[in-house]
Amino acid sequence: MEIGVDIVELERIRNAWNRYGLAFLNRFLTAGEIVYCLEKKDPAASIAGRFAAKEALVKAMGTGISGKVRWQSFEILNDAKGKPVVHITGTDLSSLVRSARVSISHDRHSAIAMAIISLEPVAGSR
């Protein structure tokens, strides 16, 4: 098991969204995530939460965004009860990630996310 955490200022997300619009969102959110976020009373809080969750996931993996891991490698949608659920969309990652969980929270100023990820053992490792 590996863990990662990230915190994002909502104002930073609002400024980028106001400046670049959908082009900004399309860089790191899937179409489903964009629909979810834009339906919210404060879309910037949900956008920041998804951004923080994806950062936390790649920190837990120890890879950062590069190579096989892209922003859209993970899609975070909510279940019927509102719990965020991680869907692995990157085919290269589906063989590496056994399970991934996130928790997302925000207030008026920031969004925070924590990720717990279980990776498949690498051949030849202990």
UniProtKB/Swiss-Prot annotation:
Domain of life: Bacteria
Gene3D superfamilies cross-referenced by the UniProt entry: 4'-phosphopantetheinyl transferase domain
Pfam families on file: ACPS (PF01648)
Catalytic activity as recorded in UniProt: apo-[ACP] + CoA = holo-[ACP] + adenosine 3',5'-bisphosphate + H(+)
Family annotation (InterPro entries): 4-PPantetheinyl_Trfase_dom, 4-PPantetheinyl_Trfase_dom_sf, ACPS, Ppantetheine-prot_Trfase_dom
Keyword annotations from UniProtKB, A to Z: Cytoplasm, Fatty acid biosynthesis, Fatty acid metabolism, Lipid biosynthesis, Lipid metabolism, Magnesium, Metal-binding, Transferase
UniProt GO cellular component terms: cytoplasm
Amino-acid biosynthesis listed as a keyword: no
Residues bound to Mg(2+): D6, E55
Cofactor(s) for this UniProt protein: Mg(2+)
EC code(s) of this entry: 2.7.8.7
Record field: transmembrane: none
EC class (word): transferase
Biological processes, Gene Ontology terms: fatty acid biosynthetic process
Subcellular location: Cytoplasm
Record-stated family: Belongs to the P-Pant transferase superfamily. AcpS family.
Known role: Transfers the 4'-phosphopantetheine moiety from coenzyme A to a Ser of acyl-carrier-protein.
Name of the protein described by the UniProt record: Holo-[acyl-carrier-protein] synthase
Organism: Chlorobium limicola (strain DSM 245 / NBRC 103803 / 6330)
Gene it is expressed from: acpS
